[in-house]
Amino acid sequence: MFMATDVEIAQKAKLEKISVIAEKMGLTEEDYEQYGRYKAKLDLNLFEKNKDKKDGKLILMTSINPTPTGEGKTTMNVGLAMGLNKIGKNAISVLREPSLGPNFGMKGGAAGGGYAQVVPMDEINMHFTGDFHAITTANNLICAMMDNHIHQGNALNIDPKQILIKRCMDMNERELRDIIIGVGAKGNGVMRQDGFEITVASEIMAILCLAKDLKDLKERVGNILIAFDKEGKPVYARDVKADGAVALVMKEAIKPNLVQTLEHTPAIIHGGPFANIAHGCNSLIATKLGLKLGDYVVTEAGFGADLGAEKFFDIKCRNDLHPNMVCIVATIKALKHHGEAEDFKVENVEALEKGYANLKRHIENMKKYKVPVVVAINRFATDTDAEIKKLTELVEADGTRAIFCDVWAKGGEGAKELAEYVVENTKEENDFEFLYDLELPIKEKIEKIAKEIYRADGVEFSAKAKKKLKQIKELGLDNYPVCMAKTQYSFSDNKKLIGAPTGFTITVSDFKISRGAGFVVALLGSVMTMPGLPKVPSAENCDVLDDGTVVGLF
């Protein structure tokens, strides 16, 4: 049977002009600025206009530990938002922006799939409204001003061996992880070791996603710890006078982007930090604006619940957000993977039952936050009746509801049962609570996450990490939340330990101090903030035909 690709489905869709979508949301022409026919930037004055309006319900979409191709969080997010609208509710999908790195790498785009996509899919996946370019430019402007300051006499006495900020680009390129700059003649600047991160791991990206407004963004940029001087004192971005120029570069990027789903449900897409090497959530501004404009906001946090959801709750929600439900996305194929099955397309109830331990642990973890939990099974044609029956029994035996959804093939219609469940189970207020208190030292926060969420026996700290812990305390940052950076494929810091491993320890190899963003990143194991391309990158299949038709995106 012929199955159209995601990009083919998106290209055949009949989109409504973004002005029509905006009008349905109750917006006037003064509330947004169009970027072509089908995209717009939302004005931040909407907060003032809607300040007396009650916030809508906030639903988080997360997942089990994924396979390399992902489990369909974005697809389920879009499907649920459309399903809510199908049953007469005013829902908005609020998502992260795709990064070009995975687009051209292994994972592909981040606009959903099948008949549960945000559109125009090709434009969203390729550059969109230019936010990532602004973030990249802003980050690299700080680096350029800092290196120029050193070259022009170094009045701040910056120690070239203690520079913390790295340049960034929105591409997977391992060759740029560690480089030497300033090589050659004296006029080329001071020679020093440097490196690149992918844009989504930069502190500017985190700041965009946690700032309340442009003023807050500018203040946070000024607080970025870029280096230490030769006496060991901190040097900030404001010290090289970069904060004003960076705020100027980010003036338009801070505004959330409005698009639509294939069924014309509004979608706000803004910011895009990865959840394995950053905090993994779309912008606070987008989420809060969605809560003012819709009765239900379906948002997401990257990768598995051990990464994205934990950071959503313990970092993002500390900014006056109260989640009403968490939806864990799982697939039978991924559970069979966690059960060590060799062929995911062949019925294997035994492997499914073994792999269920991964989902079970995520369910238990999410319940620790005192938020209602539902499991959404992203249905595939290869799922058998026996597997469906067994998974339903396993989930319900643990006191949770499992709902099979076919949003890829049916769009919002395939999520109506899930939508009804969400509406019914978000009527009452819950007792949401954080996993840890901010007054705990960073070390104890890490140990709590490791033991409560990952189920590790303990935490080891490298000599480098111990030195940084002392530095963090001296800087007065022990009361910051912690952002764990580790592999997405396992509860542990070893990607080969799939399922629900026990009897392991995690190793904190280093720390990254994100003073402007307002958290401390703990780097676990061998995690890297600049990915590399796979042996056969998806870029090899991407093209544009003579008539402008895009091919190869997924």
Curated annotation (Swiss-Prot):
GO molecular function: ATP binding; formate-tetrahydrofolate ligase activity
Annotated positions binding ATP: 67-74
SUPFAM superfamilies: P-loop containing nucleoside triphosphate hydrolases
Keyword vocabulary terms for this entry: ATP-binding, Ligase, Nucleotide-binding, One-carbon metabolism
Enzyme's top EC category: ligase
Pathway it works in: One-carbon metabolism; tetrahydrofolate interconversion
Record-listed E.C. numbers: 6.3.4.3
Catalysed reactions, semicolon-separated: (6S)-5,6,7,8-tetrahydrofolate + formate + ATP = (6R)-10-formyltetrahydrofolate + ADP + phosphate
Family in the record: Belongs to the formate--tetrahydrofolate ligase family.
Protein name (database record): Formate--tetrahydrofolate ligase
